[in-house]
Amino acid sequence: MRIKVGLKCEECGDINYSTYKNSKNTTEKLELKKYCPRLKKHTLHKEVKLKS
């Protein structure tokens, strides 16, 4: 089952990206280095639940 999750910047706290993840195959939370437009650099983004 795919669920919609957000990716929140660890440095500024903004949710910059949303994506889907398969909760059966990926049980741990996502951690990706993505571009933060507010800080204008690549930072660590962690998974958060989105209100649906």
UniProtKB/Swiss-Prot annotation:
It holds the Pfam family Ribosomal_L33. GO terms for cellular component: cytoplasm; ribonucleoprotein complex; ribosome. GO terms for biological process: translation. GO terms for molecular function: structural constituent of ribosome. Keywords: Ribonucleoprotein, Ribosomal protein. The keyword Iron does not apply. Disulfide bonds: none annotated. The keyword Manganese does not apply. This is Large ribosomal subunit protein bL33.
